[in-house]
């Protein structure tokens, strides 16, 4: 287990958005969060790196490796908890600098050789190096959408996170680019724990080891993906998976 929540409640003003969420996130596995828009998936995801702190009141416990996130320095926390967003958000810098910027900021690089090796390694991990090796000094905005999203994943990997959060990482991409990202995530999960929000149930079924279904801020069902999709226990889950609501 890499992380867990215990009796997690979250309020936007007087409106409660999450209700007593208890969940364990397993080490080196992909956990998918599914449910209709506004059900609390992304809100829950952002509790792990404290992105809700300024806009919400949070009760309960969120732990990563047994440590309460609210007692951690937020910069140190976000080094250990990477995030990839729905829209690719590359820095307006070169491809090379997109990878090297954060490790240098965190003092992780001792010399130029280390820096270059890290950039190559991260780009290779996301299958991008061969595509960009001759244009590392080019502005990252010149890449295609799918390439930009892989660069964002490589950038997140550069600071060696223990947990990677993905908020609908393929929803803005074409089917071919989405497939490339899905295969990449499955490969990365051998050495990295991930939580992924997705509106694509088939994607969750293809990629995730565990799946959680949220409805109106409540965790309705959570379990291993094969059992979750083939033999759901809760009536609301059955209805959602069959398209009866959501």
From Swiss-Prot:
It is found in: Cell inner membrane. It catalyses: phosphate(out) + ATP + H2O = ADP + 2 phosphate(in) + H(+). One of its GO terms (molecular function) is ATP binding. Its main location: membrane. SUPFAM superfamilies: P-loop containing nucleoside triphosphate hydrolases (SSF52540). It is an enzyme of class 7 (translocase). Residues 3-241 form the ABC transporter domain. It is a peripheral membrane protein. Keywords: ATP-binding, Cell inner membrane, Cell membrane, Membrane, Nucleotide-binding, Phosphate transport, Translocase, Transport. One of its GO terms (cellular component) is plasma membrane. InterPro entries: AAA+_ATPase (IPR003593), ABC_transporter-like_ATP-bd (IPR003439), ABC_transporter-like_CS (IPR017871), P-loop_NTPase (IPR027417), PstB-like (IPR005670). ATP binds at residues 35-42. PANTHER family: ABC TRANSPORTER I FAMILY MEMBER 17. Belongs to the ABC transporter superfamily. Phosphate importer (TC 3.A.1.7) family. Part of the ABC transporter complex PstSACB involved in phosphate import. Responsible for energy coupling to the transport system. The complex is composed of two ATP-binding proteins (PstB), two transmembrane proteins (PstC and PstA) and a solute-binding protein (PstS). This is Phosphate import ATP-binding protein PstB. It comes from Campylobacter jejuni (strain RM1221). The gene is pstB.
């Amino acid at each position: 287990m890499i992380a867990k929540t215990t009796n997690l409640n979250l309020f936007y003003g007087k409106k409660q958005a999450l209700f007593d969420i208890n969940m364990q996130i397993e080490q080196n596995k992909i956990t998918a969060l599914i449910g209709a828009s506004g059900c609390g998936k992304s809100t829950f995801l952002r509790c792990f790196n404290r992105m809700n702190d300024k806009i919400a009141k949070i009760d309960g416990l969120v732990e990563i490796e047994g440590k309460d996130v609210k007692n951690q320095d937020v910069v140190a926390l976000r080094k250990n908890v990477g995030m990839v967003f729905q829209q690719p958000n590359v820095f307006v810098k070169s491809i090379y600098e997109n990878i090297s910027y954060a490790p240098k900021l965190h003092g992780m690089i001792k010399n130029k050789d280390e820096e270059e090796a890290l950039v190559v390694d991260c780009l290779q991990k996301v299958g991008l190096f061969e595509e960009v090796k001759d244009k590392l000094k080019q502005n990252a905005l010149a890449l295609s959408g799918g390439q930009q999203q892989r660069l964002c994943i490589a950038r997140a990997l550069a600071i060696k996170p223990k947990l990677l959060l993905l908020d609908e990482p393929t929803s803005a991409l074409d089917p071919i680019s989405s497939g490339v990202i899905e295969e990449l995530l499955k490969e990365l999960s051998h050495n990295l724990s991930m939580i992924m929000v997705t509106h694509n149930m088939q994607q969750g079924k293809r990629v995730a080891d565990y799946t959680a279904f949220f409805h109106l801020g409540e965790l309705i069902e959570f379990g291993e993906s094969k059992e979750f999709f083939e033999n759901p226990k809760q009536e609301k889950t059955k209805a959602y998976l069959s398209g009866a609501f959501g």
